[in-house]
From Swiss-Prot:
HAMAP family associated with the record: UPF0246
Name the UniProt record assigns to this protein: UPF0246 protein Daci_5283
Organism lineage: Bacteria, Pseudomonadati, Pseudomonadota, Betaproteobacteria, Burkholderiales
Record organism: Delftia acidovorans (strain DSM 14801 / SPH-1)
GO BP, sorted A to Z: response to hydroperoxide
Pfam families (UniProt xref): H2O2_YaaD (PF03883)
Length: 261
């Protein structure tokens, strides 16, 4: 089983890392450098307009692109799972995972990325901002979906092929923006979606903040259970969520929560 996650805009390169934490390098080495060269040609104002960010954030990321190095070291990079710091990763709580948890996650978790394509949890990552939906023009097309093409799907195929035959399934916990980067025409394993709904104003609905956190909770649940199939995820019960069987299908698991007013 492979779990897909989105990255986060918020990054943490300040909190000390656990001692002797292992690391790997990103699976795509040339493509990030190609994108960095394109990004370096953007002025702060152009970057602000392209990404819809403030002048301050644009200046920060111009500096990040200039500092980006082909060499990933303990000084300029850190493991992706511990660098991301948004709602999903607050649910996942990577810092509380032990060495065996991280080893399992390294084999079963894939973080989709506009700059890196795919990151494994222990891949060193230099700080960046480049959302997958950014309309960045490159030699490969007018956006990042065209830039990455079928590469991400083919990488996921390779990772799935290394797993036991009965465990080759993709569990999508990523947003639509990021999952769109997986070319389904080339993807071989079946995909199972997970949806998280909260009760509000008389109906169950997806509430972005809660759904993002729940995706991280589900990833943590799978890691700690060493889940081998999507069926094992049906037992997910963290923070009040439970499977809604009548609203679920084998390809789409719906989890609902009704909190007290």
């Amino acid at each position: 089983m492979l779990l897909l996650l989105s990255p986060a805009k918020s990054l943490d390169y300040d909190t000390p890392l656990p001692p002797k934490l292992p690391h790997t390098l990103p699976v795509f080495s040339e493509q990030p450098l190609e994108l960095i060269e394109v990004l370096r040609r953007q002025s702060p104002q152009q970057l602000s307009e392209l990404m819809g960010i403030s002048d301050k954030l644009a200046a920060l990321n111009v500096a990040r692109y200039e500092a980006f190095s082909p060499r990933f070291t303990a000084t300029n990079a850190r493991q992706a799972l511990l660098a991301f710091n948004g709602d999903v990763y607050e649910g996942l709580q990577a810092r509380s995972l032990d060495a065996e948890d991280l080893d399992w996650a390294q084999q079963h978790l894939a973080i989709l990325s506009g700059l890196y394509g795919v990151l494994r949890p222990l891949d060193r990552m230099q700080p960046y901002r480049l959302e997958m939906g950014t309309r960045l023009e490159t030699a490969h097309g007018s956006n990042l979906y065209q830039f990455w093409g079928s590469r991400i799907a083919e990488h996921l195929n390779q990772r799935a092929a290394r797993q036991p035959a009965g465990e080759r399934v993709i569990v999508n916990l990523a947003s639509q923006e990021y999952f769109k980067s997986v070319d389904l025409k080339h993807l071989k394993p079946p995909v199972v979606e997970c949806a998280f709904e909260d009760y509000k104003n008389g109906a169950y609905k997806i509430i972005s903040f809660h759904a993002k956190r729940a995706r991280g909770l589900m990833a943590r649940f799978a890691i700690q259970r060493r889940a081998r199939s999507a069926a094992e995820l049906e037992a997910f019960d963290l923070e009040g969520y439970a499977l809604a069987p009548a609203s679920s299908t084998p390809a789409r698991l719906v989890f609902r929560r009704k909190t007290a007013d």
